[in-house]
Amino acid sequence: PIHDRGKYHIGDANVQKRVFQEFGDVDGIEENAIASHKENWLFAGVNHAATEPHAVVANWDPSGRLTLYTPQQVPHYVHRALADVLEIPMHQINVYRTFVGGGFGGKSDPFPHEMCSAILARKSGRPVRITFDREEVYWINRGRHPSRIEMNLHADEQGRICGIETDALIDGGGFASFGHVTTYYNGVLHTAPYEIGAFHYTGARVWTNKPASGAMRGHGAVNSRCAVETGLDDLAEQLSVDPIDLRLANLLPPHSATITGFRVTSIGMRECLERVKQESGWDKKFRKMPLGKGIGIGCGFFISGSGLPIHW
């Protein structure tokens, strides 16, 4: 089972990674706030379930070179893993990425069937193909982490987001996968597209006796993003401000940086929100629709580029 919040530690326990981040005047958050939202969230794990299942073909030529055909999203990871498992140099391995089809992060890891096909092909001297059925796809799950998130948001008298405090405990399953990065992403990927006065984040990923969790659709950002945007709606209600107007008032400008140091060059979120407000008929619908119907708004953010996007 997942450890209770506050009782996990690295050592003999089942904690793979723990993260602590603090930016801005964290001690002054509540002192400056006139509105606060505090909520605990419990998110279930989710599997990708792409139409195309995982598959691989492995073949060795007479000179001892391996050729692997696999619908991989990150073929370099497989290339490195094969070299380690087979104990041969990387230049003796060719990895060809075939048509991936649906991936969504679920075909990003080096998988057991890729290693097994290479080993079986070497032992048998013949090409080996492995294709998973749907149940087998679930057994090698690298889906979204089940997680427990405590999210606190605060706004000052000017309606500015003066602070966000987050604690995330995520269920990693039995293997590492992308878990080191996910532990960071649960925090740093909700520090935009808004200006934030202060940010405090603690996160931990724990091993459990389950299929591993990994990268899935908005890797590490979706659960905490949901908590942030819901919290902003609550702050808007407390401040008697329109939710779109609250977001517009707090947006990062172009050529700026998040509180954690991510560079923001171009940003079209303001134009997007203004267009959405106009085209959706927001002013005529918000808080005015019949029981059981409603209209809402939320913003997203994700990193882009080849640089290291986390604070190690």
Predicted regions and their residues:
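Structural alpha/beta core scaffold segments of enzyme domains
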Residues: P1-W312
